[in-house]
Amino acid sequence: MTAPTAPSMAAPPAPSMVSRMTALFLRVLTFAFLMVSLVIMTTNTGTIEIGIDEFKVRSKDFYSYRYMLAAIAFGLTYTILQIALTLNHISKRNGAQTSGDGNLVFDFYGDKVVSYILATGAAAAFGATKELKTQLAGLGGDKFFNKGYASASLLLLGFVCTAILSVFSSYALPKKV
């Protein structure tokens, strides 16, 4: 007598496909964090009251916030490029790399550079927001600075996702190069 066989199941995806899907998930998450951070920061305006005068402030009025916006734009550009490359790889299902080992080297260095840029952008925004909020306390700019904190926090989360991707690319590089 033979034992009944289990119904046939689809084979699990290859390990390289699982890592690409994980990378895609983290890149989409990074994109979402950066996009929301960008929207919050570009639409952030406030009014500071000094005596009888009112001054309208925007994020572009402060150099640290400008740097943060540039870091977000750079991060978004890189993330969109990497999402496109990852989708191309997944659709072709062609092993561990799309265009030779150069793609892994690009991932390795790109993830490192972009994660540092995002980290410094978040740090600049946190530092500027803390300093400005302290200096301008009681002048009516709390809502403006709280949005600055929110935007910097989302940028920091984008950095964390990119840093995790940087670790993944560090592990993938010695295997393929």
UniProtKB/Swiss-Prot annotation:
Cellular localisation: Cell membrane
Please state which protein family the record places this protein in.
Belongs to the Casparian strip membrane proteins (CASP) family.
Query: Where is it found, in Gene Ontology cellular component terms?
Result: plasma membrane
**Record keyword Secreted present:** no
Q: Topology: which residues are Extracellular?
A: 42-66, 129-153
Oligomeric and partner information: Homodimer and heterodimers.
Membrane topology field: Multi-pass membrane protein
Q: What is its main location?
A: membrane
Give the transmembrane ranges: 21-41, 67-87, 108-128, 154-174
Any Pfam family matching the protein = CASP_dom
From which residue to which does the signal peptide run? none
Write the protein's name. CASP-like protein 4D1
